[in-house]
Structures are given as C-alpha cells and as structure tokens.
Amino acid sequence: MGAITRVQAAVCVALYGLAPAAQAQQAPPAAAQPQDQTAGALQEVTVTATRRTQTLEAVPYSMSVVSAEKLAESGVTDLASLASDVPGLSMYQYGARFTEATVPIIRGINATGEPTRGFRAFEQAPVGTYIGNSPVDGYFELDDLKQVEVLRGPQGTLYGAGTLAGALRLIPNSPELNTFAGQIEASGGKLAHSDGTPYAVRGLINIPLGDVLAFRASAKYDYQPGFVNTYGLFARSNNGLSGIPLLANPAAPVTSPAIYQDKPDWNFQKTFTGRASLLWKPADGFTAELAILHAGVQGDGGPQVNPDFPGGVSPLDPATTLPAGGPYREFSQIDQPWSRYTNLASADLTWDVGFATVSSTSSYYTTSGSVLQDNTYSLGGLASGGYLPYYAGVPTNPRFVYDQQFADFAHTFTEEVRLVSKSGPDKTFDYVLGVFYENQTSAGAWTIAVPGTPEYQAAQGCLPNCFFNVTTAPGDVTFQQIDTQRFQDKSVFGELTWHFLPKGQVTVGARHFSQEFTDAQSYDDYNFPTFLPATPHESPASKTVGKVNPSYQYADDQYVYAVWSQGFRRGGANSVPLVGPFAESPLLSTYQPDSTNNYEAGLKGRFSNGLSYTFALFDIKWDKPQISSSLPSGNLAVYNANTAESKGFEFESSGPLFVPNLVYTVSYAYADAHLTSDFSLPANNGAQTGTIVPGLIHGSSGQQMPGSPKSSASVALHYDMAIASDYDLALAANAVYRSAVPMQLTPSLGVTSVQYSSSYEMVNVNATLNHQPWRTTLYVTNLFDRENILVPPTQFNELGNLTNDYLVSIPREVGVRVAYIF
C-alpha cells in the first residue's frame, strides 16, 4: 500500500470510527486535567476572517486555524515551515534565502516554476499575507502570535486583488490592560550532519501603563548553523558581486590558480524579529493600537547538495583536484551571501458607534534584500559547454567566476476603513462596508559580473574594457536589468448577509477597484551590445469581483454551505529586448491580468465534546494564468497561458480519542491543478542569433501546475498528564506528507523537461514539562533524519555533474527549550 493510500485509509477510519466514539467520550474530572492543556486543545476556536468575531465552524467557507501552541509543537517558525505543516498550503522550499522569489500557494493556484532568480518579476503573489489587518511582504519569524488563519479560495471582496487563491492572516497578541506578565526563553540543540549548535533566545513582556494604556514587546534571535560542507571556494578580495579572486602565485597572473578553501557547515542562517505595540482604551467602545515590527535575516548559501560529482580534476582548472560529492556536500566557486530586512508600522483604531463598529487600519511597510549567486558551473554546462570559451577564454581562465546579484526593495502604504454592523439573533441583515487605498513603489536590479576577468585580461595584454574583444561596461559588469514600478489601488467593497431563516443565511459581496500600474525597465547587455532605456509602460485596470455564499445550520453547531467567489490579479510589462541576438517576440512585452472563479460546497461542525470537522469540495476556474519564468534565452518574463483549473477536496478533524486527555488532529487536501487548454508563444531559442522560434514556450492541456503537490496530509497527537503535584507533562507528535511536486510548466534556459521533487515526509515530536513558573521542552524535528529532495537539479549531468544540485530538507535537530514565565 502506497504512502498516500495509507493516508486516505486513515482518514476514512477517522471519519467512520472516531466521531461516534468521541461523542460518547466523557471529559475527565477537572482536577485530573493538566492546567490549560486539554481544555486549550479542545476549546472553541474563534476567528475574525469575516471582519467580525465568529466561531471557526460558523465561517461559511474553508479555512484552517493554527494556534500558537500548535506552531510550537510542529516546529513552525516561518511561512515556509507553515506551508509544510498545513495541507493545501505550499511553497517552493528555498528557505529565507529566496524569500522574495517564493510565495504561498493555496489549492495549486500557481503557474510559476521554481525560482531561478533572487526575486519575482514583481507580478502579484496569488495569496495575500497579513499581519493583523495589515498586508505585508518580506521575511519574519512567526513569534508572539495568537493564531494563524489560512483562508482557502479567492477572497476578492474583503481582501482585494492580491488574494487570487486565498489569504494568510497572522494574528499577533495585543497588549493586555491591567496585566503585568512576560516570558524569557532560550533553546539549544544538536543539528545532525553539522558541527554547529542551533540556538535561539526570545523574550516578551506586557506592561500596564495605568488603567487605559498597555505596552507589549517581543523579540527573538535565532541562529541555525549550516549542515552542508562546501568545496572549491575561491578566496576573494571581498564577498560581494565584484570580489576579485586572489592568486595562489602572484608572480604568474595568467596561469596562477585561485587560492582554494573549503567551508564546513557553510549554509548558516541568523534571524532577528522584534515587535512592539501600544494599546490605548480611554473609554468603552474605543481602542487604538500602534505597532512596529522589524525583522532581519542573513546567511550564506542554501541547503543545496551535490552527491553526484565523482571527484577529480576541476573542469575549469586542470591544476586543481576536487573531492567527490556526497551526502551534504556541495561545490561553489564563491561564497553566496544573502540578506533581507522587513519593517512594518501600523495603527488600528476601533470605535463602537452603537449600530456598528468603525475600524481603520493604516500601515506602512518596507522590505529590501539582496542575493548573490554563483552561476559559474551552470554557465559552463550550458550548450554542452559551448558558452564557456566565449566567457572564460581559451585556455580557460583558471580563476573564472560568473556570478549574479539580485537586489530589490518595496515601500508600501495602505489605508482601510471598515463599517461592520452589529449582529445578533434579532438582526435580519448584517453588513460590512469599506474603502481601501494602496500605494506601492518597488524596484529590483539583476546584475551579472565576471569578477577578476578584467585583471586577467590585462595580464594577457588585452586592451582596457574588453571582454575577449567585445566591449563591456567599465569594470566587470556584463549585464544589468533594472525594473522600477509604481502601483496604486483604490477600492470600495462590501458584504451583505441576509438571515432569511432562523438558521439560514446568504451573503452577497462585491469589490470594485481602480488600479494604476506603471513599469519602467532598463536592459543593458554588454556582452552582445543591447541597450534598452527605461521607458514607462502603464497598465491601468478597473474591475468588480463578486461573491455569493449561502449557508444553513441544520443542527446545533452543524453547518452546510456553498460559495462562489472571484479573485483577480493585475497585469504588467516585461523588459525583454526586441532587437539583437536575444531579441524576443513583441508578444512577450506585456502580460495580461488573470482571474479566478471559485465554486465550493462544504460541511462544518463541532460536537459538545470538542470534536470538530470540516469537509469542502472545490472547483476553481482560472482564466489567463500568469507564468513567470526564465525564457530559453535567459531573459526573464511574465506571460499568460489560456485556461487552467484546480479541483479537489479538503478534510480536517480534531477532537478527543479513546484515551483520556489524548487529542488528535488530522487533515488531508487534494488539489488537481492543471491546464485545461494548450497554449504556445514564440520565443528566442538562446542560440545568440536572434532567432525566434514559434511555439517554443508551450504547455499542454492536462499538465499539472508547478509548485504544489496534488496530495498533502498531516496527523498530530497531543497527550496531557499530571505526573505530580504542580507538575504537568504534555507529549506531542505530528507527521506530514506531500506528494511529488513539479518544478516548472514551460521550458526555460537549460531546462527542456519537467522535473519533480521527491515525495515529502516529516515527523516531529516533543515533550513539555510544566512546573510554574518554568516550562521545559525536549524537541526533535525530522525525527527520522529524512533527506527530502525539495527541488531537483534543473541542469543534469553537465560539467562533470557539477551542475547536479539538489535542494534538501533540514536534517534532524534535537534540542531543549527552557522558558521562565512571569
């Protein structure tokens, strides 16, 4: 029986056997329950996804809620690890290094292949991410949160144009009035296959400032050591884009090899996330909360390994011998540092005016980052090595480096004002009305350089500013593309709920928005002289999206619902040359908006003993899916397919099991996202002749969309017991499964066939001892030390297999976390 068949069988057993038994299960006496454990696991969950407080079961569409306790038990620290834990939610698992190039994916609504660049082409993400009520982008750890809400399906009416497939809401803890409390926590452990020590320190404090003010602050520093040993690194003048390789023999500048060095535990990462908030409640019915967040992450390299290189003479330097590849071994010519910084300031005001509540959310966020990549081996492997002589000379420059840097920033201001009516059993109608404004400026630069090549040419007697007799930019830059964008969104939205029966209701909603998008891109290729100045291209859009959502409560806390909802994403322009050896078709100069129509029906409920369940069927029709990729020529562009569809189902259930104080959570999602019609576009074939081949970019009906699995599942168990007076023990385990994931949809530079990840399995366990004011946790992540292949190589068996890089999951970590709570 296959892994997914076993998961499906387990779900069926849970549906058939657990509910009746759980309904008969009696809660143990209160004195036998560990403090705040079992009650917390089974307590009713409330959410604010509809802009009013409701129980999770009463929200008439599919959504998941992950509590702070569950985040800790599952080892979830950021959006990528959250995506591994929640079925139906996925991301390309590149870690924090490629944060700006990877986005959350819900229900398979994504057509963009694995990121080959350090940032997206600035197309909007298909899923909106919010901290509280504020939209945000960038990298931050999930710290001091009340819960995470995963809203599945288009959320165009309440959440706008950035929610083509759904939304993620990260709900932070707010300051508490008249309460002084805090926590200090430290953790440390052992990471398999690493000599480094992972550790983290965090603290939070809540301080009352009189009767109407309260302050809350939290901070966390997290260090993750590397686990990949890297070989063949050059010592350079610096670790930036233009760091010049140092000569092993300065007296022989033409033939001297570089100074080689190896680095154990290369791919480290360190993160800081801090948030401070101030709550003011001068009177009943009015609150104001101001908050700031700062997050920074930096590191070197990534979790890439090369087990295939047989060892031997370097294909680029015959005087140097490299060791064989193997588990947790990698090869790189240079260090590859990266960083990202994110800041968010927000102000939330709420005023109870009697018949309704008026709310305002103002926010301003910035994110900036850079990624340095070594593309030397990839270039050497392209066209069976045909590119290498042009770039590295004959004989090959023994110190040749071909690196690229991606740097970007975005500044975004948003303002939203909402009017939410008071609800109650005597109300026939409820409504939400609002206006929204967004103003974003963003820019990104892609720069390619050959550091050390000008010095090597000078040693050969070459004239200044030449690149094997081809004019280049001053210095070592061979290519640069700069993209500057300005985006404005002005929207009005509303939802009206009619309670046409005592237990029945229907919600209708709409959002009308007017958008202005201006894009100006420059393109400078010094190798094959092509220079395109930045010419602004405007892409205005105006559209109305809708929603119809009937639901009926057929028994106490048991609901059936249906929903039709729409999503929309803006179009834009590409900076691709239309002349020269890498000229592209004018059809690739712009890309069109895409949109989704979601048809969904489901059942949700909760029994008196705490057992809850959700079952949803969905079918999403997707028009003009946007695809961002590296073209066969190496140019970067966004373009459209014709039509696609995602259909499937989701199931979640949690509740007590047969053993007192033992609680289960099981969830499963199936999403068959695929093209529903063929498409093709002309593109440059990359042969440096300016040849545009009809249909070179293409996709076929039935082809699976990239970036997400068809099947994903998770199972978690939580057991509480009192082991002595004032000593409580909590045991938890969770396992996740994901089927193989396709990495791309269309051909790109050096890639002619679709590659797949391996299936993904992961088990985490932990044990927590509570003895107030202390809490001690022993944890193990990746219990069986599985090396899941998250991203396979896109260039196989080239340059002596030096291009065979596999992105793998983090090895097993065993550690202890100690917290003092006051």
Question: What are these language model-derived features?
Answer:
Residues 1-76, 80-86, 206, 284, ...:
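N-terminal Sec signal peptide and the immediately downstream disordered periplasmic leader
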Residues 202, 346-353, 357-363, 368-375, ...:
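Membrane-embedded beta-barrel scaffold of Gram-negative outer-membrane proteins
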Residues 256-431, 438-440, 612-614:
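Outer-membrane beta-barrel domain signature, strongest for Gram-negative TonB-dependent receptors
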Residues 279-283, 419-422, 430, 434-438, ...:
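Structural signature of Gram-negative outer-membrane beta-barrels, strongest in the C-terminal barrel
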